[in-house]
A protein has these predicted regions:
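Solvent-exposed loop/turn segments at secondary-structure junctions
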Residues: 124, 181, 340-342
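Short, charged, amphipathic alpha-helices and their helix-cap/turn boundaries
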Residues: 35, 41-48, 89-90, 132-168, ...
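Active-site helix/loop module of the DD-peptidase/beta-lactamase fold
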Residues: 55, 60-64, 78-130, 161-162, ...
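Catalytic loop of the DD-peptidase/beta-lactamase superfamily, centered on the K-T-G motif
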Residues: 1-49, 56-60, 90, 171-173, ...
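Active/ligand-binding-proximal structured segments within catalytic/core domains
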Residues: 65-69
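Aromatic- and glycine-enriched pocket-lining scaffold segments that form the walls
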Residues: 168, 173-181
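Extended low-complexity intrinsically disordered regions
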Residues: 1-19, 26, 116-149
Length: 361
């Protein structure tokens, strides 16, 4: 399914974009794909799908949710209700966080700041993929279909058994950790006195008129497209309903596009704030993937396009294969999903975005 495009000769046409989304399902791991592309000047607006997904279908955006957390945290900061450089202990108290960062026999959980959490520089281990003393992790159990709720208290209990990656705020260090965002979710609730799902709705979804976007809270809700893990659908509704702040939002490509453009156009905060977020630390080396303050950067090396530099993609990936990125060099915006939890589908999404960027000049 596609929506009609109205664009100038500068942008690729419908046939090219139809072929692009069709290429996304060539990978044997990708059973369905959705791609939405828009230009900042509004002259390109296209949406299509291939495989077992529809262009207007709801899907789990997974960690793209973290950009919503970024908006809320910065809003609270700008209102003077939150200090990024305050220790998380100020908002969460001592009891909850005690033992969450013990390195060399010293508990430094009281040294972890809100800025450390949102920039993934806290050193606190990711509860989802961090391996415990028995060599197992929570992620493996979930990917095998063991659907269980993971409230914050359980997350912190798990983290207490895991070794931190580095000292809080250690220069040049970054570790992607869902634990950080679960803690941020609770901080939002403490400051606002409301459930984080309600805060998302009040500060982000309703102001943007997003009617298909919501925090997934009802395990009986089957309206989002089921996620795939390799060749099979994976149903973990209890888990998703329990992890709102780290990745529990449902949306559509069109509504994620509305959010993505608002994130970068000054709707939520002054454009200068985007520069504040660009304090990059390399997550994957020697790869080209960096984490800033609440956003990610996928740098596209010159080898991908030696004669036509592509620049960078700013936004976020979701473990589910969801994506939301802005290419500032061409002022293009991309949202959608490959709906594959294994990680093997992300390359298909990158290839699609690169293909569109190369065709835009």
């Amino acid at each position: 399914m596609t929506t009609a495009a109205s664009h100038t000769a500068r942008y690729p046409g419908d046939a090219f974009l139809e072929a692009t989304v069709a290429r996304m399902i060539r990978s044997k791991s990708v059973h369905g794909a959705i791609l939405c592309v828009e230009s900042g000047d509004g002259s390109l607006s296209w949406r299509g799908a291939a495989g077992n997904l529809r262009a207007d279908q709801r899907y789990f955006i997974a960690s793209v949710t973290k950009m919503i957390v970024t908006v809320v945290i910065l809003r609270l900061r700008d209102e003077g209700r939150l200090d990024l450089d305050a220790p998380m202990q100020r908002y969460l108290g001592t009891e909850l966080i005690r033992g969450s960062h013990v390195l060399g026999g010293v508990d430094r959980s009281d040294q972890v700041t809100v800025r450390h959490l949102i920039s993934n520089t806290s050193g606190i281990t990711d509860y989802f993929f961090g391996k415990g003393p028995d060599g197992t992790n929570a992620g493996d159990a979930l990917l095998q279909g063991n659907d269980e709720a993971w409230p914050l208290e359980r997350v912190v209990d798990r983290v207490r058994t895991l070794k931190p990656r580095f000292l809080p705020g250690q220069p040049g260090k970054v570790h992607y950790s869902d634990t950080n965002y679960e803690l941020l979710g609770r901080i939002i609730e403490v400051i606002t006195g409301s459930d984080v799902a309600d805060v998302f709705d009040q500060l982000v979804f309703r102001p943007l008129g997003l009617r298909e976007t919501y925090a997934y809270r009802d395990p009986d809700d089957t309206s989002p497209a089921p996620m795939y893990y390799r060749g099979r659908p994976l149903h973990v509704p209890k888990y998703i309903a329990s992890v709102t702040a780290e990745g529990g939002v449902v949306s559509t490509a069109a509504e994620m596009m509305t959010f993505l453009e608002a994130f970068f156009d000054g709707t939520f905060f002054p454009p200068a704030t985007i520069d504040e977020l660009k304090r990059w630390n390399r997550i994957y080396f020697p790869g080209q993937f960096d984490y800033g303050i609440g956003i990610e950067r996928q740098w596209l090396p010159w080898l991908m396009s030696p004669f036509q530099p592509l620049g960078e993609l700013l936004g976020f990936w979701g473990q589910s294969g969801a994506f939301a990125f802005h290419n500032p060099q061409r002022d293009l915006f991309f949202t959608g999903t490959v709906n594959q939890l294994s990680g093997f589908g992300h390359g298909a999404a990158v290839s699609a975005m690169v293909r569109v960027m190369k065709a835009t000049s």
